[in-house]
Amino acid sequence: MDMNEIKEIFFQECEEQLAELESGLLKLNDGDRDPETVNAVFRAVHSIKGGAGAFGLDDLVSFAHVFETTLDCVRSNRLEPNQDVLKVMLRSADVLADLTNAARDGGGVDEARSRQLIKELEALANGELPQAAAESAPKTTPAGVAPAAPVVNEEGFQPVAFSFDDFETGDEPTIEPSTYEIVFKPKSDLYSKGNDATLLLRDLSRLGEMSIHCNMDTLPPLDRMNPEEAYFSWKISLKTDKGEEAIRSVFEFAEWDCELDVALAGGTVGMDEDLPMQPVPFDLSILEDEAQAPAGEEDRAAASEGDSRNAAVAAAQTASNVLQMAQSTARVSPENARNSQSASAAQAAAQQAASAATPTIRVDLDRVDRLINLVGELVINQAMLSQSVIENDTNGTSSINMGLEELQQLTREIQDSVMAIRAQPVKPVFQRMSRIVREIADMTGKSVRLITEGENTEVDKTVIDKLAEPLTHMIRNAVDHGLETPEKRVAAGKNPEGTVRLTAKHRSGRIVIELADDGAGINREKVRQKAIDNDLIAADANLSDEEVDNLIFHAGFSTADKISDISGRGVGMDVVKRSIQALGGRINISSKPGQGSIFTMSLPLTLAVLDGMVVTVANQTLVVPLTAIVETLQPEASAIHSFGSSQRLISIRDSFCPLVDVGRILNFRGAQANPVEGVALLVESEGGGQRALMVDAIQGQRQVVIKSLEANYTHVPGIAAATILGDGRVALILDVDAIVAASRGQSLKPEMSLAAAG
């Protein structure tokens, strides 16, 4: 594994830490004052800072350090996390995410914004904002006030009140440097755990003046040396004014992989004084060199020509660089204790918790995708085998059939297990929307509150990855277009703070995501006039409210009076609709003037496999998702009733349900089929309505592999995807909700119907 791969793992861990940071800050913003929430937020920033320091990402380290210092003030109860404080911290979390992305992608950041937030964070750490409401408090650090040092909250000590005026004289108190004796003994597997002694010593040298003695007593002969193991240990003398906590924080990510003793000069340290020590000149320029690959055969041959001790020094340099070829693993370390006794207790407790935790492993998504594809092929081959057994009319009691049934069960279990690997909660996407709301609210001068529900609803990772873009467009529209300004809301008798509600839930085997706002609703007159001006509809067109609302999905359509950085170019909602359709989903709008709008997106839980009922319609084989079917029944002539010229109803247990001829909806036939000669599938749409879909016959139930029709052909209304049956035939999977919508009068266009697909 090279350095780029290790960095990528670090950035993946940063994404997790940023999500934890965002979640914790939002909890605090909602009034949560659980100390563990504060600790989780602090650990997230501290972990990012520690990893960034190992890779020399100085900008990220500097900002995270100031952020961490301010959070430590909250941890030690020296700073009250009121709304003003949390606003600064939420914006700081956004900047921390920007710096992380810039370090990952090589892009730029808003340096002016970063500097401003550093000033605000330093001001908070210095106590310049009161703990109560502080609307009039300054947002920048006054001249003459130095940034706060990390707060030390040792047990048995109480915070002491003081005045910042004491620092205005220029005679700032200084802390006398102390000399610490440090013994650092890495365990043999230090490098394989993602740590490097040279990086740790480099970070330690930044704390003050340092001299080092290296113990090479455990160094084996060259022929038995493993360059991936650690053999050296160090005794370090450090003169610093930072204190013991700062020293221990350098080794925080290696504390489980080494023995570390820190004591003031003159105290007792853990290394045997009789052990042979060899002074090592400490040249930081050596540590700054880029790590190279392990020595080749020529290097090892050259090393073997000299004394084994001299060769060992070269081998040790190679060993220190091997980390950059080793896999780095995520670590959630316990908080550093404030003294040596609490440090030992915290470490023991953390190790016990870690041993009890559920083990996890990080796997490349490409490997998971390949596994899912193989499972899909396994499902197809299992179906083909079942078809062959049926065609050969094998005795149902034979060992072949028994083995086939076991194979079907195992295939189902494998498929369920694999799909569970890819299933992830929508929480990361929802948390990302919080930042969008904050940014748009600041740009528009609106007061907006985002409420999220169903964050733990799970869906396939492919769906989650492609969900962020359409949700971003919808959130921007909801805040910019949907919500009124505080003045207009007050005039309308509303709360000046607007509300955007984002919810996720499972329904009918799909995931349904709703985005609702309590704004003014869609101005249908304005939408209609804009559509007429753009020649989208005729001036005398008679459109329902639903049809008018759906006009906003046309490409280039916008009701904005002027173009801004947020909206007005008409490239938003059409992108949303295309993105949702590409995932096999749908989007609907419900709006009430003066009350707001609701956008409902319906998406499949997975894009890989589904359980379906194979049916025949006009000599064509189709698949209906089982999750949408309530029951099947054979219609009787007495249960069929005509309504109007073309509508038919079927009586089911003293209630009437519209009867939909699937073949006619899909333009497979012109005249309606005789319902008595077919089978009715009672289906339920996501909106809760029921329809009886009329098909010619039922072939059976199958687990089928979903193949994208849009990727290979185009989007076909009424069709969700395609699949390959056991006999090799291609069958199309019905989009039940689209069929139900078409039965309400929104007929499918002939040129885009199933017949057009060939």
Swiss-Prot record:
Residues 297-308 have a biased composition (Basic and acidic residues). It comes from the Bacteria. It catalyses: ATP + protein L-histidine = ADP + protein N-phospho-L-histidine. It is found in: Cytoplasm. Its EC number is 2.7.13.3. GO terms for biological process: chemotaxis. Signal peptide: none annotated. Residues 1-103 form the HPt domain. Residues 293-346 are annotated as: Disordered. Its main location: cytoplasm. CDD domains: CheA_reg, HATPase_CheA-like, HPT. GO terms for molecular function: ATP binding; phosphorelay sensor kinase activity. Keywords: ATP-binding, Chemotaxis, Cytoplasm, Kinase, Nucleotide-binding, Phosphoprotein, Transferase, Two-component regulatory system. InterPro entries: Bact_Chemotaxis_CheA, CheA-like_dim, CheA-like_homodim_sf, CheW-like_dom_sf, CheW-lke_dom, HATPase_C_sf, His_kinase_dom, HisK_dim/P_sf. Gene3D superfamilies: Histidine kinase CheA-like, homodimeric domain, Histidine kinase-like ATPase, C-terminal domain, HPT domain, SH3 Domains. The keyword ATP-binding applies. Residues 320-339 have a biased composition (Polar residues). The modification Phosphohistidine is found at H46. Residues 609-745 form the CheW-like domain. One of its GO terms (cellular component) is cytoplasm. Involved in the transmission of sensory signals from the chemoreceptors to the flagellar motors. CheA is autophosphorylated; it can transfer its phosphate group to either CheB or CheY. This is Chemotaxis protein CheA. The lineage of its organism: Bacteria, Pseudomonadati, Pseudomonadota, Alphaproteobacteria, Hyphomicrobiales.
